[in-house]
């Protein structure tokens, strides 16, 4: 009895301490809780990346055992470094057959030019500035993501969705020299403004988004779908009445502006190089190492890609299964809790990818913009489920680093 009483007495201070921590945590402002979550998740990713950096051998990007900043600036980071230093080429590089090869025109200008401006002001290195721009943009994206989830989910679910956002397998993008974090911040802000029906305020955000990541056409499609639903089934968008000719003008303007900015970069590449298909041919260069040089035929790249990876007819069958699975997730009754706007964005972005993107090892990174669908993943309240989901995300993050980021000899799986 005495032993049992002593054990109970010893556990009381521990329980009291845990209770105090939980209470204090719940009393913190939502933005401070998200900041803590984001900071802890970035520490975790830093540990994982540093582990790979310690075993990294010399390669075309870095020396053996590079510093964290050097290791975080490889792959596309090398292209952004070139753009920040010298801008874009006026003459496209070509191979012996006359086909355009990989070059800087594949990358939008907002991120590298922002980095260059800050380098000029601070005198800091590209690696330092580029990683910090991504880190701060990722922090902003996490805060906006929580606000966006909070429009549809209760605080607990919204916070858990943000935890998943912070530890997702490709959340590495929040602390490397890539434009994804900056692009995601702008995208989430545009979606939040859409949910708030602040259409005119969306315009500068959409303009910046379109020159940060190639999402202009997809966002334009989202706005077209939004207007159609607003006219035909306004209740699905929580609207008290149908969109009229007058009230449809603001979202229609956003759709037009987003579409134009989506076409602007190919037009700029044409104007600078004198080659009408400079941007398209540059993008095709990246897939030529898989399937050789071929023209872009909309809505065929995924059939080609799945055929290359899995052979036919297995590739096409698997592609159909993937698309049906995506539709099942987006249109299941439970998914209605995150709002039709976010689900329509997932559909619009997937349609855009199906039209132009060739699935390869960077597919996981390219899917980052559908992060708002994590709200569906966050719906179950089971603690076991939530812990298991976070653990799985961290394991997949390590797996992604192993297969896609770490350079292991001749690496053909770029992130």
What are these regions (language model features)?
Residues 41-58, 220-329, 342-346:
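Membrane-lumen/periplasm interface segments of specific transmembrane helices
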Residues 125-129, 145-167, 342-344:
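Transmembrane-helix signature of polytopic, membrane-embedded enzymes
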Residues 133-136, 152-156, 160-192, 209-219, ...:
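Multi-pass, polyprenyl lipid-linked donor-dependent membrane glycosyltransferases
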């Amino acid at each position: 009895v005495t032993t049992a009483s002593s054990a109970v007495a010893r556990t009381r201070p521990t329980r009291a301490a845990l209770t105090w921590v939980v209470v204090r945590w719940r009393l913190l402002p939502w933005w401070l809780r998200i900041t803590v979550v984001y900071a802890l998740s970035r520490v975790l990713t830093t540990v994982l990346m540093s582990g790979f950096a310690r075993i990294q051998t010399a390669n075309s990007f870095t020396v053996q055992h590079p510093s964290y900043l050097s290791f975080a600036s490889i792959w596309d980071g090398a292209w952004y470094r070139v753009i920040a230093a010298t801008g874009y080429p006026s003459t496209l590089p070509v191979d012996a057959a006359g086909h355009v090869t990989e070059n800087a025109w594949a990358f939008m200008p907002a991120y590298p030019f922002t980095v260059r401006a800050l380098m000029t002001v601070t005198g800091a290195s590209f690696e330092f500035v580029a990683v910090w721009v991504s880190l701060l943009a990722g922090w902003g994206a996490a805060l906006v993501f929580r606000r966006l989830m909070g429009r549809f989910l209760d605080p607990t679910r919204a916070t858990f969705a943000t935890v998943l956002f912070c530890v997702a397998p490709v959340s590495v993008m929040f602390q490397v020299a890539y434009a994804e974090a900056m692009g995601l911040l702008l995208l989430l802000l545009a979606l939040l403004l859409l949910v708030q029906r602040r259409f005119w305020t969306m315009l500068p955000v959409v303009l910046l988004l379109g020159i940060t990541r190639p999402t202009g056409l997809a966002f334009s499609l989202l706005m077209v779908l939004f207007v159609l639903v607003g006219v035909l089934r306004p209740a699905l968008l929580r609207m008290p009445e149908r969109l009229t000719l007058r009230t449809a003008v603001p979202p229609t303007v956003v759709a037009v502006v987003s579409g134009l900015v989506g076409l602007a970069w190919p037009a700029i590449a044409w104007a600078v190089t004198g080659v009408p298909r400079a941007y398209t041919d540059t993008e095709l260069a990246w897939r030529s190492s898989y399937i050789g040089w071929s023209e872009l035929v909309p809505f065929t790249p995924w059939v080609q890609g799945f055929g290359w990876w899995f052979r036919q007819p297995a590739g096409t069958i698997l592609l159909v299964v993937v698309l049906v699975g995506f539709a099942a997730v987006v249109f299941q009754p439970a998914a209605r809790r995150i709002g039709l706007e976010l689900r329509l964005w997932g559909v619009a972005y997937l349609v855009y990818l199906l039209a132009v993107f060739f699935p390869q090892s960077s597919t996981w990174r390219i899917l980052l913009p559908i992060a708002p669908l994590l709200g569906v993943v966050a719906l179950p309240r089971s603690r076991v489920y939530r812990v298991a989901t976070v653990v799985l995300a961290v394991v997949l993050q390590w797996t992604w680093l192993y297969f896609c980021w770490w350079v292991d000899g001749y690496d053909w799986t770029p992130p």
